[in-house]
Design a protein with these regions (language model features):
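Conserved glycine-rich cofactor-binding loop
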Residues: 13-14
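Conserved glycine-rich Rossmann-like NAD(P)H-binding loop of the short-chain dehydrogenase/reductase
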Residues: 27-41
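The beta1-alpha1 cofactor-binding region of Rossmann-like NAD(H)/NADP(H)-dependent oxidoreductases
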Residues: 50-60, 91
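Substrate-binding pocket helix/loop in short-chain dehydrogenase/reductase
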Residues: 85-86, 90-96
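Active-site helix of classical SDR
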Residues: 109, 144
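C-terminal helical subdomain
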Residues: 166, 170-171, 190-235
Length: 235
């Protein structure tokens, strides 16, 4: 079903984004990777360099896609995470998380809608269980993921009002063993080691398989949100 489909993935150079891009390539999709580190993209992915903290670069990147007949799927995967408490956190980290996790997701969605075919496209947002419950000391990261959840629901409602056939979905994973997790626990490596010892974490391939299931859902079916955790992650 994905053969020949044009799929744009943000943050496709590592972690979940890279795993999804590889799974899509195996299905015959035309994958476009929008990220800063294009040298780390998987072979076969069309590179599209962009700093997602800069709105003008996002606009320019999507303008360069105007030559495509249409874009079929947008996967908003890019994200950053800092364990930055409200009481003592660094406002510069808050600002960066908000720019990438929230603003860029909204802007990419806005631009992608203009490239979707009249029959509708599909937007898949990679969120987090932190968008459903707030972990201790991770309040501001959770705030960005609650915002992603709100944007996902709001966009779906807007498109229904507009009688659009575009589908909007999200995946909210628990712990996934990626470089993002190392970034999140920076300075608290002992805590991360303890978590890794106690929890059999999800893999990037787990998320990729779920993403393909959502994108391949039958016409007329919209999977709204999939919450995922390993069987031994309690919360």
């Amino acid at each position: 079903m994905l053969s020949g489909k044009k799929v744009l993935i943000t943050g496709a150079s590592s972690g979940i984004g890279k795993a999804i891009s590889q799974a899509l390539l195996a299905e015959g999709a035309h994958v476009i990777g929008l990220c800063r580190s294009i040298e780390n993209l998987s072979e076969g992915v069309t590179p599209l360099a962009c700093d997602l903290t800069v709105p003008a670069e996002i606009e320019s990147a999507f303008a360069s896609l105007a030559s495509l007949d249409a874009l079929d799927v947008l996967i908003n995967n890019a994200g950053i995470a800092y364990l930055s408490p409200i009481t003592t956190g660094d406002p510069a980290q808050w600002d960066r998380m908000w720019k990438v996790n929230v603003n860029a997701l909204g802007l990419c969605s806005q631009h992608a809608l203009k490239l979707f075919p009249k029959s509708g496209g599909h937007i898949l947002n990679i969120s987090s269980l932190s968008g459903h419950r707030v972990p201790p000391t991770g309040g501001f990261y959770a705030a960005t993921k609650f915002a992603v959840r709100a944007i996902t629901d709001a966009l779906r409602a807007e498109l229904k009002l507009a009688k659009s056939s575009t589908r909007v979905s999200s995946i909210s994973p628990g712990f996934v063993d990626t470089p993002l997790l190392d970034q999140y626990f920076e300075g608290r490596e002992d805590q991360l080691s303890k978590t890794r010892a106690e929890v059999n974490m999800l893999t990037t391939k787990d998320i990729a398989a779920t993403a393909l299931h959502i994108i391949n859902s039958p016409a007329g079916v919209e999977i709204n949100d999939v919450q995922m955790r390993s069987t031994d992650q309690s919360v």
